[in-house]
Every structure is written in C-alpha cells, then in structure tokens.
C-alpha cells in the first residue's frame, strides 16, 4: 500500500500543454477611396475616433432626389460605421448660404416681387416683356446644351402664348377682371424671363444684405425638414458660411502668406502653378485628367464671377478665387483686401479646418463635386496646413438618374424630396437605396421602387408571422424546446448568413449584398415555418425570435427602422415603456377568438348572414384600424398589426382583382350566349337555303339548293362540289337537331 502511494506521488498528474486554435483573420472594413480609386483598409488616425466632413447643400431652392441620393447614402454609411463597426464618429456638415446662385436668385426674387407689387398696367407689362425677350433670345441662341436649350424654348413659347390674350384685350380696350386675369397669367409665365431682365438692369442697386440672407434661411429650414422626413440623422455640428467669414478671411490670409495665393483688384486667387510646382504638394489629386478643363472651372467659379474683367485678373486660367471683391448688388464683408465675399471652395476648407484640424479621416460629397470643388478644397487646405494629407479617405456617392435619364427641369423629370415622399414612404426610399451600391449610379424609377415595395412587404410578412408564433401561449419552460434537425439546419444557415453579411459590410459597406443575404435568410425561415405548419407542429419560438431580432437590429442600423429617441430612463420605471402592439394585441386576440366561436356556430346553424358580417369585419372594418385577420382552414385566425395605408391598398387591389374576375366571367358568359345564339341561328337555316343567299359566289343551284356553277357561270369542279356537299350534310344534321329540339320544347 505504501509503495503504491509513493508511486502515485512520484507520478503526479499535471495538465497537458494547451495550444490555441489556428482561427482565421478577422475581416477588416475596406472603403472605396476616390484618392486611389481602390478599396482601401479603413484605418482611422486616432483609434476608434473618426472625423468626417460632408459637403452640405447650397440652399436656394427645394431639395431634390439628387440631394437625397447623397444624404441618405452618407446617413447609411455613417450609421454602419457608428452602430455596426462601433467607431466613434464626429460628423460635420456645412450649409452654403453665400454663393453666386444664392445672390442671383435672391436679387431676382426681390426685384420681381417689387415689380409685381407695383401692379404694372397691361400695356407697360407687354412693353417690359418684349424688352426682356430680346436678351433672352440672345441667351437662347448662344445656348449649346440641348436640355437647357429645350427648357428655354419652352419658356419662350409659354410667354408668347400668354402674351397673345393680353395683347388682344389691350387692343379691344377691355378693362376689369378679364384684363387682370391675363396680366396675372403673363406675370407667372414670364417670371423667369422678367427676373433675368430686372436683375440685369436693376441688380446693382440691391444693397441690403438681409435680402441675401432671407432666401437661404428659408430653404435651409426646408432642407432640414426634408432630412428629418427621410430619417437622416442631423450632423453633430453644422457650419454656415455666413457664420465663418472671419475664419475664412484668416484662412485666405495664411494661404497668401505661405506663397500660394495672390491679390488682384481686391480679389484673392489661388496660384495653382506655384502649388503644383512644390515638391510637397500635388494638384488635382482626385481627377488629374480634368485639370485645365475651363468649362468645369468656370462652373466652379459661379455665374457672377466669370466676366472678362474677372478672368483677366488671374495669372493662369486654372487659378480660382479664394476671395471675391464684391461688385454692386452683391453682399460684402470687410477684409484686408477691401469689401468682398468668400469663394466657393474656400468655404469648406476653412470650416472643416477650423473644426477638424490639419487632417480628417473622411470627406464625403457627390460624385459631381470631385473636380473642381474637392480638388480645389484639397489644394487650399494643404497649402494652408503645408501638408499632403488633409483628407485620408474621400468618399463620393454615385449619380442619380430618373428612369434612365439625367434629372433636369428641362426634361420635366425634376423630382423634389417632397414629391417623392408623396408617392413612397421614407423607409421605402431608403430600402431602394440599400438595394444599390452607394458609389454607383442609382436609377430612380417605377421598377426600382416596385422592388423596394416588394422587399418591404416580404420582410413585413415575415415579422408579422413571427409575432403571431410568439403570441402562442407557452409556460416558462416550454419556450425552450428540444431542437431537431430542422432547427439545427436553420440555425447553421442563420450564422452562415451573419458571416456573409459581415463580409459584405466589410467590403465597402455593400448593402446590396446584405439585402440579398437577408432575403435568403427570411426565405429559409419561411420554408421552416411552412414545413412545421404542414405537420401541425409549432415552430421553435426562441430560434425564430433570435433571427427576427437580428434582422430588426440590422434594419435599425441602416435607418430603415426608427430608434426610440427618448432621453434618460423610461417614465414610470422599468418595463413601462408603451408599445401599441403590446397594448392592443390582447384585445384583438380576444376579438379574434370570439369571432371564431361565432363563425363556428353560424356554420353549424347555417346562418349565412352572420358569416357575411364576420367577413365584413375582417375585410372592411378592421383594415381601417390597421388590423389584419388571416383565416386559415382548421387553424386559429392569425392577427397582425399592419400599416393602415398598406392594408387599404391591399383591399383596393383585392377589390380590383375581384372586379376583373367578375368582368371576365360576365364577358365569358356573354360570349358563350352569343356563340349559342349564333349556333341556334345557324341551326334554324334549312340546308336547301344555306347557299341561296351567296349570289356573289354562285350563279346556279340544283333542286336541293346545292351550288352547281360559280358566279361567272362556270360549272364547279368535282372537288368544289364535294366540299359543298359535306357542308350541306353537316347543316342537314344541325337542322334535324333543331327540329327535334323544337318538337321537344327545349328552347323558347
């Protein structure tokens, strides 16, 4: 015994050596960087903190679907980086409220309203319209862009049509309401034309700066309301150009001090040649092939800044304005070079530089801003900071087309965000965007939106079915059921799809693939639920709930499901946050069970009126309240809370289909009746008379009424005679059948 214990002491057991599993490298986020035109690994400069600047709108008109393309797409990207990849994102966006377009539009609106308030006499209005048509015609003749030319021609034609009735009224010396009505029509049709003319003649007299701030303030508010309606998160900080003029002046001064800017006639220009010749810098990082494109450069300078005298101030045509000396009729701010206003490109550089410093992680904007705007932003900022890395990742959202065409007022396909939201919900628009790559062209069309609507309906039906399954009563332990092969297989597919979705998000936030993987996962769940239903077995609640919660979580990340935005703890303590579904569903369940009991008795007692009332409750009353009852033979009624408008559309569609079926049935019955009537009419004809009326074909007949000669008097061939004989015999049979039916009284 002692020997045995001693032996055990010498051979004491120890833990075996452990080795970690080989594992796989985690997938890393890659983003398409316009600076390299490749997908690059995303590495923020400061741990998980991400600094992000997004070019905001120039606010002088209603926001349109082109704006939605950028801001919904960037909202999705921002949410994914923040809520999925857990980056600490600081998101900055600007509002451009000083710009050539704003100045011109504000001036024109002000002058036109002044003109309208003076209530010009009809003769004076006609004279002014004719005066305005002269420069307008010159502009029309000089326009080469076909879309713009078409729009101008349409304006000219509308003005000419509106002019004729007023001219006739003046010539006829009419007065009163009829003339006033013609005046109002012409004023409305000639608004653009008169505004241009008034601006060219009186624009230099507009000196009140408040006129130039009123317009952008109105349209900025309109833009924010549109973004809220689209469920686009507000920026962490919003910068307005008008609030950063001192910072812009200092920014311009330092660029001049660093040797990359020069003063000319009170304006300051960026010296592109000096910058490009520096070993530390590169000009045209984003679109080097566009450097020197004068058309693009002039568009970037603005309509009020490309006159011959302005262009002559530059050392090189490629140089661009950092600061513009204000001309009469333009807003101005004091600066070392005289009164002026900021150039377009410098505004973003100064505001972003002030808040984000010498180097930011992400800069975003629309694809059409790459050159000259973003290339000039980069040049200015790197000239200011004397570095070569002002932006680490430049992201550009793709274009938006309307049914395959460029969106344009001239093509009459200009769609504002408000117009789009009248047709589709914010969620449906976002789903359409999610089903496309954020960096590629998105075609906003009926087909695109129909796909989004079907996707929404597909997901919603799944969520409603899972909710119905989860409402089935089980005790506390019954919710944890033993898994069979079907559950194990579905769970494996679930985790496979989660992996695929993660890889897709790492691959340049590929939401298009994510949406397809989510669709495939739901399809697998639907097959599982159908299989369980077929064998009268309840699906596994916990597994389906996990999958539904995951899908809901992803949709929340994408902004397709709104988050609860309440602050702090819920009112009333834990577990008291109100939910419409949790509140009303018990009552609806009681109503459903009561209705099932009533229907059962009505069927047993054969009371069709009760069944009709029950159907009316399901089909007509409950949809108005956003409630859907789904009856299944031999199974409990499924209760679903659905958007009221969706149910009403479904009801209308059901009625339309039923009406079509009714019409088709009536049409088939009518055709059948006509065929029977035609057959009966044919049966009534004695065979001896069937050919006698065809005198255009035959000229002679035998004693039985059979044709013997054609219309030219030639005897019929044996083949023709044989064919007619067969027809005769067939009619003879029909006629006998008719006589028999008449004798039996088979028809009236």
Swiss-Prot record:
Details of cofactor binding: Binds 1 zinc ion per subunit.
N-acetylalanine PTM sites in chain numbering: 2
Residue ranges of coiled coil: none
UniProt xrefs under Pfam families: tRNA-synt_1e
Similarity comment: Belongs to the class-I aminoacyl-tRNA synthetase family.
Known partners and oligomeric status: Homodimer.
The protein, known as: Cysteine--tRNA ligase, cytoplasmic
Organism: Homo sapiens
